[in-house]
A protein has these predicted regions:
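Conserved catalytic cores of very large enzyme subunits
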Residues: 1-277
Length: 277
């Protein structure tokens, strides 16, 4: 990377579970664990900015939408999809629930696209992930929130699709670089997708001009959170005599969601071509 030095931590994907338990205390902040949708969004912005100041590259939060859905359900109930058009803000605006959700989307996304002084007045490099149902259940099937509850696929699926459509439309009004998005789709190991609905939705979003990465895997043991980083748990025990590494790029994290990279060098081919001519 032309802007940095080798050896400095480049990018990282984090698990947000400690954030749910301790808030920002362990990072030197004063905010305790978020308790509702409003505090979650505000503290999440501070979380990403705090971590990004320690890295030159991306901060990936694959669980962002799953946690956002958790706090929406805490505030408005597990059946909030049945009340999207209900007025939930009794002020002069009289906003419906879906409008409130859109406003939180806007708060988080627009804040992430603001230049940061501790990053040379560049924005944070923020990545998120989407999952089809099979991939989601493979990665988060045994996951439980601190209160013992489990993620709810039906509401998360709606939230993922709604965010993608909202973000695609928002980019028609503003120049928004982040988040960089990765859609994780599980295949049958041959030439087809297990969750055909999400495969069709992915194609639909591309047809609408949306720009995002797509990660295909025949096993939910691995995860990609950005353009270059992939990790795999089950392949750790495989040995290839031709080299001494596996596909599990493990340097800073502790799980399939939490990982990172170091000394990543990006070749700027466009610049090389310009200099050569």
């Amino acid at each position: 990377d032309e802007s940095g030095t080798p050896g400095y931590p480049y990018c990282v994907a984090i698990t947000m579970y400690p954030f749910l338990v301790d808030g920002l205390i362990k990072l030197g902040g004063v905010s305790v664990a978020p308790t509702d949708l409003k505090s979650f969004c505000g503290e999440f912005i501070n979380l990403v900015y705090s971590i990004s100041s320690q890295f030159m590259g991306a901060v990936a939060t694959p669980e962002f939408l799953m946690y956002l859905d958790y706090f929406i359900r805490k505030d408005y109930g597990d059946d909030y999809l049945d009340h999207l058009e209900d007025v939930v803000e009794m002020n002069t605006k009289k906003r419906t629930l879906v409008k409130v959700i859109d406003n939180y989307f806007q708060q988080v996304v627009h804040s992430m696209n603001m230049p940061a002084g501790n990053r040379g007045y560049q924005t944070v490099f923020w990545n998120i992930s989407y999952f089809d149902e099979s991939y989601f259940r493979g990665v988060f099937g045994d996951f439980r929130f601190p209160d013992g509850s489990e993620p709810k696929w039906e509401t998360l699926s709606w939230l993922q699709k709604h965010f993608m459509n909202w973000f695609n439309e928002e980019r028609n009004r503003y120049i928004l670089t982040f988040p960089v998005e990765t859609m994780a789709l599980l295949t049958d190991g041959k030439d087809d997708f297990i969750d055909k609905e999400y495969a069709d939705f992915t194609a639909e979003m591309w047809s609408k001009g949306h720009s995002f990465f797509c990660y295909l895997s025949d096993s939910p043991d691995s995860l990609a959170s950005c353009c270059r980083l992939r990790n795999s748990i089950t392949e750790l025990d495989k040995v290839d005599e031709s080299h001494n590494h596996t596909t599990h790029q493990y340097s800073m994290g502790t799980a399939s969601v939490s990982t990172g990279s170091k000394s990543v060098m990006t070749i700027n081919l466009n610049r090389l071509i310009q200099l050569a001519t």
